[in-house]
Amino acid sequence: MKTMFEKIWEDHLVGELDAGSYLIYIDRHLIHEVTSPQAFEGLKLAGRKVRRPEATFATMDHNVSTRTRDLSLADPVSAIQMQTLKKNCDENGIRVYDFQNPDQGIIHVIAPEMGLTHPGMTIVCGDSHTSTHGAFGALAFGIGTSEVEHVLATQTLVQKRAKTMEIRVDGKLSDKVTAKDIILAIIGKIGTAGATGYVIEYRGSAIQALSMEARMTICNMSIEAGARAGLIAPDETTFNYIQGKDFSPKGVEWDLAVKKWKHYVTDEGAKFDRTVILHADEIAPMVTWGTSPSQVVSIKGVVPDPKDANDPVEKIGIESALKYMDLKSGQKIEDISINKVFIGSCTNSRIEDLRAAAATVKGKKVSSKVQAIVVPGSGRVKRQAEQEGLDKIFTAAGFEWRNPGCSMCLAMNDDVLEPGDRCASTSNRNFEGRQGKGGRTHLVGPEMAAAAAIEGHFVDIRNWK
């Protein structure tokens, strides 16, 4: 009896190098402009070529401006990184979706929507949120620049074998409770180091009921729980999403692929090293209050008191977060005012996210105290949203409608918070300075962010009108 992780691992195992270290084969290598330049330079210096350019795909996302596609207006360092990626890809025969390509977008949005992500694959990228692709039953994880070079040169990677963790979420979610709330509740329960050394498999009826886009949200934040990767077993929802995409198998190959993919599920009776259980009906809309994704409470909660900490380390963490976030213990989450809203990122920038946010703000107006932006995850998402009129709903409400990119998720482009700004964000990290020096980030789902933009503070989306 084997877990899904064990099946994928064994199918890609090249050999054991020494005690605890293994060489595994990589099926798909995704690259972007920030973590690849030094890797390509290393290849040149060593006189090596890219081993499998056809298995490598690139896009520009981290540094891309969502305001303009005029590279002359970009930050000089960002412009150099984007130009370098294009040059490196052209020289090595790698397909690149640059900032002028209509299908450009965040790497973890465009790869699945193009059918590049399949069950049973190994997928790596020089980006920690590569775990997103685990929603398809692929073993996907982030790697460092030296490892990017190794994969480019050999199509293999040296790894230690992870332990297995089962996270079960059974039952039915309450209305307006989303995948973002599930993963924040999980991180709140086990902590940001709770899954260190593990690959998580998300299981249970509540997980099986999720759409593919919602599953991607769950797996996206596996890294925030400390995990190496996150997996969800492939099923008909998975197959229906992949079918007909640009790079998905066609005809007879499709039937053979689905037959193979159905193998990548955990066998009944297989043992996990650890199991964590949550009940879906107990999960409420969640809001982070601090500077770690684990510092999270329900919308009906309050900012915690350091005196209630379980240990001295947690106490210091709470005290530090309270100071940085300029909050007081006992303060109601619903009383926290915000002045910025960001709907986007590889966590929540897909069409379902934008539909939910647009439905929330339709016919309403953004608070005069708030600047709110919506950043589609890809050119395809943007075009689909515009075909459905979502852009008009957002702009009529007072939101800014932008071009695709990582945007305000991280302070590496021209979408940044100013010191003292407080942002309701659908992204995945709320560390100090993550969205800009001195900026304060509260992680929420798309509908919660949209409602906060209208009211100027957090509200319970379940009974908000």
From Swiss-Prot:
Coiled coil: none annotated. Its EC number is 4.2.1.33. SUPFAM superfamilies: Aconitase iron-sulfur domain. [4Fe-4S] cluster binds at C346, C406, C409. InterPro entries: 3-IsopropMal_deHydase_lsu (IPR004430), Acnase/IPM_dHydase_lsu_aba_1/3 (IPR015931), Acoase/IPM_deHydtase_lsu_aba (IPR001030), Aconitase_4Fe-4S_BS (IPR018136), Aconitase_4Fe-4S_dom (IPR036008), IPM_dehydratase_rel_enz (IPR050067), IPMI_cat (IPR033941). PROSITE patterns: ACONITASE_1, ACONITASE_2. This is 3-isopropylmalate dehydratase large subunit. It comes from Leptospira interrogans serogroup Icterohaemorrhagiae serovar Lai (strain 56601).
